[in-house]
Amino acid sequence: MTLQFPIQAPARYAGETEPVKRPREFACFSYDKDHKFRLDDSSMKWYYPPEIGTNLSHGYDTFIKHDDSVDEHLDSLLKTIADHEQQTGGPIDAHIVTWRGMLTKVGGSDASFLSLWFEMNATLYRLTFTSGYKFETLSTIPRPWGETTRDYIENRDNEVTNNKEQYCSVVRTGFGKSIVCLGGEVDAIWDAKPETPGKPINWVELKTTAEIHTHNDRFKFDRKLMRYWIQSFLLGVPKIIVGYRTQDGILSGVEEFSTLSMPQDVQRRKTAKWDGNVCIKFASLFLDWLRQSINDGGVWRIRRENKSDHIELFKVEEVGHGSIITDEFMNWRIKLSLNKDKPPGFEPSDAADAEPSMAEEPVPETASASGAY
């Protein structure tokens, strides 16, 4: 049996807004230069302005690209969650566990110009993708400014671009009635992490785009801004820095955007019309429907055909969890459930006692979600 969630016109989601919980980082992990998992913040970068006029295609031949054709599922995210639970003595408070990329697609699927499960082919746009990673290399340093040598700062153009190295933030957030645990890559930090856990962090999202010359260019850019906004909003990233490139791939300028004010700024320009509240409401209604629909075990698939007016949910395996949930995590949860000796003062909430659904980042066509475990 296939269940369907209807996608209606954006105006149908206008009106009363849905409550949103501010994303709070409770854990993190890193991938090193060889893309090896590390339970630390060793791959965190600091923002430092790039040099205008730099060729973003420089280093194309030495670019070290992560093989994203290998599906890593939720493995790293689950390892990080398990480590956090071992420290706190109880399960995380969440209904849904997934990567930011999945909710980015869901949040933007109400607009007709975005297709939920279809993205650009990296092999067709390799130069564009490489320029984005190059911009990150030019705009970041591995330590705070005062601890980084002048020689390193001035020679970032000669650094090998490597997208295997990543810092990933793990946050707890919420949309409407759904509490969500999200993991996602963060490009850089503006200053420093606050000493108090859960406080807002001045993260920076880095993007590149072609120069804007015409009204049509502006329209296309404002459409892109919706995706930029959703990505940043989900992880609590307050600042987006966009590098503009010429047709020859030269960095011609940099502009800073506030995540908070971006939806209003786009609406004032009256070009590509999108509403942040509509994105949030759509995501909230979808997550609520998803939680009610996945009411038993097995493996489920979430799919939206290109430009379809609905999202499909259907079961692909009657029992088990496929490869979504690792044996290591399942064994840890069994051990946790058998452990009757809770740490002093530990009182899990009703939401924490509930069994969350796991949704993994899909290959371009589909995503999968498992039922309760």
Curated annotation (Swiss-Prot):
Residues the record lists as binding a divalent metal cation: E136, D187, E205, L206
UniProt region (Disordered), positions on chain: 340-373
Cofactor remark from the record: Divalent metal cation.
Coiled-coil parts of chain: none
EC number in record: 3.6.1.-
Keyword hit for Heme: no
A Pfam family of this chain: RAI1
Keywords: Hydrolase, Metal-binding, mRNA processing, Nuclease, Nucleotide-binding, Nucleus, RNA-binding
BP GO terms, sorted: mRNA processing; NAD-cap decapping; nuclear-transcribed mRNA catabolic process
Cofactors, names only: a divalent metal cation
Enzyme class of the recorded protein, top EC level: hydrolase
Gene Ontology CC entries for this record: cytosol; nucleus
Domain of life where this protein originates: Eukaryota
Binding site for substrate: C168, E185, K207, Q231
Subcellular localization(s) per the UniProt record: Nucleus
Catalytic activity: a 5'-end NAD(+)-phospho-ribonucleoside in mRNA + H2O = a 5'-end phospho-ribonucleoside in mRNA + NAD(+) + H(+); a 5'-end (N(7)-methyl 5'-triphosphoguanosine)-ribonucleoside-ribonucleotide in mRNA + H2O = a (N(7)-methyl 5'-triphosphoguanosine)-nucleoside + a 5'-end phospho-ribonucleoside in mRNA + H(+); a 5'-end triphospho-ribonucleoside in mRNA + H2O = a 5'-end phospho-ribonucleoside in mRNA + diphosphate + H(+)
GO MF assignments: metal ion binding; mRNA 5'-diphosphatase activity; nuclease activity; nucleotide binding; RNA binding; RNA NAD+-cap (NAD+-forming) hydrolase activity
Subunit structure: Interacts with RAT1; the interaction is direct, stabilizes RAT1 protein structure and stimulates its exoribonuclease activity. The interaction also stimulates RAI1 pyrophosphohydrolase activity, probably by recruiting it to mRNA substrates.
Family, similarity comment: Belongs to the DXO/Dom3Z family.
Function, as annotated: Decapping enzyme for NAD-capped RNAs: specifically hydrolyzes the nicotinamide adenine dinucleotide (NAD) cap from a subset of RNAs by removing the entire NAD moiety from the 5'-end of an NAD-capped RNA. The NAD-cap is present at the 5'-end of some RNAs and snoRNAs. In contrast to the canonical 5'-end N7 methylguanosine (m7G) cap, the NAD cap promotes mRNA decay. Also acts as a non-canonical decapping enzyme that removes the entire cap structure of m7G capped or incompletely capped RNAs.
Protein name, entry field: Decapping nuclease RAI1
Organism: Chaetomium globosum (strain ATCC 6205 / CBS 148.51 / DSM 1962 / NBRC 6347 / NRRL 1970) (Soil fungus)
Gene name as annotated: RAI1
